[in-house]
């Protein structure tokens, strides 16, 4: 019997620096560890890696001497690209996923000869978008493959192959499902071209290494099936080759706990399938209902062609090698992955907090401390005096507002690190960011670090009819904190984080009223590694309240108030979770039955979720036993086996009981400086009174308020500190050294002034 190799090693050993970028292969053929071919820097845990070539000059990368760990890997995904990656040991990990081929004319190829491949999800020949008609292949000759999901030929017109060669591979394990061919076609294409997918099994004298799908609810094969309009949109052929005379008895091709959806093209249950070796013809019956689960795909009833042409039973003294799924080894793979990720993580900050009251993983973000002061003097989307100009400036900087009102933007992206945005300095009724066009987020952090954002309103909206605009997004960034901000009217999510993230905090924010176009009024994705979410108010969201979105997520989620979610509150993929002293109140739009703190968490290791002190209004039994509010499906891990008896280590947060936090959050969350606006006032009133609902469009609730511009304070030195404040403290009015002078607590005078604006 062959089990997964117990010594599975799946991650890199080299220390990575934070980049949040894509590293591209620059040559033709070469070894992965050749940094020059990557432009001077090897891909790392915090970067994506991309390998592309041309028809005239194809690229081939061989990974044989080093462990490699990246966020996402693409092989031959460009239009008309030709590229291949050969894994010949020891290991390759792409935690967020892998694309093998993608766009029209792509010719991507992944070959696993030996070693261990660990991938979040694998897409071969596209992920369902337009113009993704590649001709791409995965070939597994040996080693071990562990992945969450494999999608083959998911795009109309694509051609792709999954080729399993013999029985040398230790195991091929898919957590969720193996999707082959198109089962979701492109609505925009009136006559979408069909996809063509092949699953090729080369059988040797001991059989072939099977594919195991093991998720209790999702583990299965999904073949192309006609939709309700009769569109089949693709073929999936089974191809058998013989490398030797086959063993007798049954041969397992795909093991699954659930019955497959659809079937191979022109191969119904019991259909004969044939293969040839040395002028001999062998035949089996194909079943989709084999094994103990009655859902394995197998070759049964072997026969061989006799001299007279008749098919007769085939019996030898050799049975096929026996493979079985062993969860313990998958857990071992994840533990090793986490160990290496931990070894590469940045250390937690120390010294001076970002501001008094900053807590959690992002508490020590430096922001613009000690840098220049930049003023936003108008509400323009770009140009001198605009917010865009300020955030795009290089170097440490603190952004202050000299005008209140509504900034309508096509999307602001923070890429330069060491930034503080002090929304509490806006005069009048404060500042609000509104989305004008495109599907980019209204405000985004991308590939940056050490950012502090406070007292800012971000309300994307659907004013142009383009409803796929998120209010705030952070990706590929670390060491940042979002404090006392208000986000609303986003779609598909309103305040969300994803990609390569680490060490961040979202605290004292109001995240409310997602736009429910296409039923996508989703609240927040929680991606990356270590994060703290505390004392936030989530209201009127359909789902993702929040959605933990990565197997690396270590989240401390406490003292939050969640009101009026639709069909689900928290769910998703995670590593560890503290879910402590949160207050959940179902509302008029809540349809989830029974209402739950967390539903269907996707975790690999046991004892990964700690729940304590949470309140579910109307469910006293859930309050007495919080685990009753975790709806974990029965599976390979039983629901109670997910429960941790102790909280996971996390930076300190001043924590109250759920009932106390409810009052504190309703009084203080959101952009309350210089004043709370009518949107947050209405949302808070809804929470207190059990009113309101999920909306489709901000017009249903009156849209953006009018924000008074106000008058900025007199600042003779233009250092960001008003004359009146300096006079009260005996400071000179026009000394250029005052603002950045550092006190005994480590704060500059400018920071002391900014922090004084938010003291109750």
Region annotations inferred by a language model:
Residues 68-75, 93-102, 118-135, 146-154, ...:
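Extracellular beta-strand/beta-solenoid scaffold signature
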Residues 128-250, 582:
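Extracellular beta-strand/loop-rich repeat segments of large surface/secreted proteins
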Residues 32, 85-87, 108-112, 138-140, ...:
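All-beta strand scaffolds that present successive hydrophobic residues in beta-strands
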Residues 16-105, 240-309, 313, 377-382, ...:
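Solvent-exposed adhesion/ligand-recognition segments of exported proteins
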Residues 53-72, 379-388, 396-420, 426-439:
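N-terminal extracellular ligand-recognition/capping segment immediately after the signal peptide
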Residues 698-760:
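Extracellular calcium-associated, cysteine-rich motifs in secreted modular proteins
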Residues 78-84, 90-122, 127-130, 407-532:
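Right-handed parallel beta-helix
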